[in-house]
């Protein structure tokens, strides 16, 4: 199956609907579709082009994961919700037309820049999170393997699920005392992380938050 035209009767592309359709190269989405589910096109390695119609209001987590042939995606004006990080492990060109989000220097934020949704600069080694940010979203920095240094401001209150999972070059980190929750797998696989300060303000640490880290006992 190399080409698909989704019929006009479809309003929702469900979670994993085209996942692992590795031969799919062409897809037409009609303007009656309103939502694209989690992992909807994940691992569609031959998909070269996709146009998200202006009817879509929601795009799910990891929707375009490992779409290695996909050169670009435009988030249309109609999108009001991005669940998790739809663009995790996809390095193509991103353009955002939705007024509900801001794409600035390869970082995707919500419209107030209070939440980081996707950090997409895969070559940078250091980053200072802006003071406007209060939430680091699910999978926001996931698999940013070059990132070795990170500054989290004291405006941040929560670190989302898998936020830094697979950041294998991250060496040390100070979590500010504004943070109250660290979600599941937040730092999973950060194998270079050998120094970490967790403040007393943290009341919740999720399952596997530091799994695979080289932290002292």
Regions found by a protein language model. Give the residues of each.
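Structural signature of tandem-repeat unit edges
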Residues: 1-12, 22-35, 45-58, 68-81, ...
């Amino acid at each position: 199956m190399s080409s698909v035209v989704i019929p006009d009767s479809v309003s929702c592309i469900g979670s994993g609907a085209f996942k692992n359709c590795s031969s799919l190269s062409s897809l037409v989405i009609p303007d009656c579709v309103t939502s694209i589910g989690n992992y909807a096109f994940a691992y569609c390695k031959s998909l070269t082009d996709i146009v998200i119609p202006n009817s879509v209001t929601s795009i799910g987590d990891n929707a375009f994961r490992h779409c290695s042939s996909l050169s670009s995606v435009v988030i249309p004006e109609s999108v009001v919700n991005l669940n998790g990080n739809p663009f995790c492990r996809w390095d193509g060109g991103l353009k955002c037309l939705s007024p509900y989000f801001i794409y600035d220097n390869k970082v995707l934020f919500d419209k107030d820049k209070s939440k980081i949704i996707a950090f997409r600069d895969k070559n940078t080694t250091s980053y200072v999170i802006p003071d406007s940010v209060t939430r680091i979203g699910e999978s926001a920095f996931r698999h940013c393997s070059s990132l070795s240094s990170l500054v989290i401001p004291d405006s941040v209150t929560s670190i989302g699920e898998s936020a830094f999972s697979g950041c294998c070059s991250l060496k040390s980190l100070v979590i500010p005392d504004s943070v109250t929750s660290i979600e599941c797998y937040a730092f999973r696989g950060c194998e270079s992380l050998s120094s970490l300060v967790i403040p007393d303000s943290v009341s919740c640490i999720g399952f596997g938050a530091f799994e695979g880290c080289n932290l002292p006992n």
